[in-house]
Regions:
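Hydrophobic positions on the alpha-helical face of helix-turn-helix-like DNA-binding modules
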Residues: 37, 61, 130, 146, ...
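Arg/Lys-rich amphipathic alpha helix in sigma70-family domain 2
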Residues: 63-81, 89-98, 183
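Short amphipathic alpha helix immediately N-terminal
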Residues: 136-155
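Solvent-exposed, charged amphipathic helical/linker segments at domain boundaries
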Residues: 156-162, 167-255
Length: 318
């Protein structure tokens, strides 16, 4: 394969990552799927006859890769998808394996910075944690149909050609997928991280968290805020329980420092806990959901693995 064709493949990496992420629910698996797609495309380049666009050909390969990866796998979810809320004094159950959970993805890996603003808002909506979790309720082929038709705006005939099926089958799968998603509760989130009011809220949140002023922090939370900490299945509902947790089992977060990033179309922060005098180490990637000027979701993804994926430093020094 020529260098030129290789560069043509790379042009599509970001959008393929977004597609595979929606299909798989894991940023790590999405990266693996895209890499496998590129390898297969590279090896099969001589057989690409050009009857379809390079983009369509790549999506066919990526879809097959994702379907292969999903064969026999369990449905990924958020803690609130698996059971009722707990209270702050609940004893933590053991953490569940990584393949239990939806994992966050950095916006830059899936969203084109030069996209049309209206299109960018729509794409943010379709990488929200709640939406990606809802997609996992669909059988894999239905999932592919819905993403290609509803998110990427492909024609039914294009999807039928990709999946080697009929237009009627595509339309039927789309109807079933829509019906399933209508039964899944989707949280509402204000997806305008650059909005001045939202920026002010985030500044106040970081200030309260770093000072560990829990009264101030709780005042920023929505009455129906949800708080979770994958890999633990426990989740909390309401400002009171979140505040109790922060002052109780979560008190080890006192003295943390925060670095801003973005994930799943939302504001996010790398939280670094004190490790030794003058040194802070990765603890949690926090993804914040906001609605009506208050924080409605606090998703704390524990562990250092995501920090490297998000380009965050391995430690902070005073």
């Amino acid at each position: 394969m020529s260098t030129t064709v290789g560069l043509d493949l790379e042009v599509h990496r970001r959008e393929l990552t977004g597609y595979c992420y929606r299909m798989l629910g894991s940023s790590f698996e999405a990266e693996d799927a895209v890499q496998e797609t590129m390898v297969r495309a590279w090896r099969a380049a001589d057989s690409f006859e050009g009857r379809s666009a390079l983009k369509s050909w790549l999506y066919r390969i990526a879809t097959n890769v994702c379907l292969d990866m999903l064969r026999g796998s369990q449905r990924r979810a958020r803690p609130m998808d698996l059971g009722p809320s707990s209270t702050a004094d609940t004893v933590l159950a053991p953490g569940l394996p990584e393949n239990t959970w939806i994992t966050p993805v950095q916006d830059d890996r899936v969203l084109a910075p030069d996209a049309d603003p209206a299109e960018l808002t729509e794409y943010r909506e379709t990488i929200r944690l709640a939406f990606v979790a809802a997609l996992q309720h669909l059988p894999p082929r239905q999932r592919a149909v819905l993403i290609l038709r509803e998110v990427l705006r492909w024609q039914a005939s294009e999807v039928a050609e990709l999946l080697e099926t009929s237009v009627g089958s595509v339309n039927s799968a789309l109807q079933r997928a829509r019906a399933t998603l209508e039964e899944v509760e989707l949280d509402t989130t204000d997806l305008s991280p650059a909005d001045p009011k939202q920026q002010e809220l985030l500044t106040r949140y970081v200030d309260a968290f770093e000072r560990y002023d829990i009264d101030s922090l709780v005042s920023l939370l929505h009455d129906e805020v949800k708080f979770c900490m994958p890999p633990y299945p426990m989740w909390l509902s309401g400002p009171l329980e979140v505040g109790r947790w922060m002052l109780g089992p979560g008190a080890g977060c006192r003295g943390s420092r925060m670095l801003a990033t973005s994930a799943n179309g939302c504001a996010a922060f790398g939280q670094y806990r004190p490790a030794s005098p003058g040194v802070h180490e990765p603890w949690s990637l926090q993804v914040l959901e906001i609605s009506d000027g208050r924080i409605t979701g606090l998703h704390n993804f524990l562990g250092p693995e995501l920090f490297e994926a998000f380009g965050l430093p391995a430690r902070l020094f005073d």
